[in-house]
Amino acid sequence: MNSDLTSFDKIEQKIGGSRKISNYIIGGMLTIGGIGFLLASISSYTGRDLLPLGNPSTLLFIPQGIIMGAYGVIANLLNFYLWYLVYINFGSGSNYFDKSSKSVEIKRKGLFKDVEVKLNFDEIKSVKLDISEGFNPRRRIALVLKGRKKPLPLSGAGELKPLLQVEEEGARLAKFLDVNLEGLK
């Protein structure tokens, strides 16, 4: 969540989506692996080597060739899905806070349509810092809304910022919205 303070009564934060280095690396590996398994399967069926490495034409089509073909199909299906998410930049968006109109706009790119949430300042109970360490650490800022059990996350999924930066952004947002800050221990 990049805080771009445009003026004293407005805050706009840009949220990154699925266009991350890790998704490009995993997508590339899935592409190469999926095509490789499919070519190995086709090589075992036709008896011709379609891969420059190894000798897949000597593999028996049943069961090795069929299994490699299934792995190739599964890898390519996952591959197309991941590249589609990267193409649409799934999860990207913005948070817009306007003090003069006392409104909050949260926009995110969804899988098939965009999600847009509009709130008034009086619907916000507090700003919550959701911090958990361990194997799968999480450091995110969320809005606790009146009449809703689950907080509304503001930070992007998979963002792991330094703890001090998350605390400062949460405190700045709570002060801007004139609400309490939860989650500090």
From Swiss-Prot:
Could you tell me the membrane topology recorded for this protein?
Answer: Multi-pass membrane protein
Query: What keywords would UniProt list here?
Result: Membrane, Photosynthesis, Thylakoid, Transmembrane, Transmembrane helix
State a single Pfam family of this protein. Ycf4
Can you cite a GO biological process for this protein?
photosynthesis
Sequence similarity: Belongs to the Ycf4 family.
The record's function comment reads: Seems to be required for the assembly of the photosystem I complex.
What name does UniProt use for this protein?
Answer: Photosystem I assembly protein Ycf4
